Amino acid sequence: PPKSIVPKIIGWAIPILIVALIVITFFTNPSAGFDQALSWILWTGSMAAVGAAVALGHPLAILAAFVTAPVTALHPILASGWFSGLAQAYIKRPTIADFEKLSEDVFTIKGFWRNKVTRVLLVVVLTNLFGSLGTFIGGADVIRVFFKNF
């Protein structure tokens, strides 16, 4: 059977809805629209940054998570964890020794957090996980402010 286009439609409909709610609120009440946009930026960015921090990511990886999350949350193909993970991998470059010890380090918690390869993966996964949580909270707040003004 051919692939359904429903997941693609849903993947783009939710971000379009969020942006539309903010734009409509801006036109009816600029102050509330600003509050919505600020809420979206702070919830998505902060939660993604918290995820990167929980993974003990480099401060620039945490900053990358905060800066990219509000935009990547609106794009179904991009993820803020990719950008924070890329920053982590660029700043704290894994060595050949990290790759060689990978098969041993994945079996202990200490090794999992110490190995630079798995640390990059932790930064990616936790940034995305917490960023998704921030997207739900921020989206709910955008909807709340929208209905409060109408």
Question: Can you say where each PLM-predicted feature lies in the sequence?
Answer:
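Compositional signal for N-terminal targeting/processing segments
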Residues: 1-150
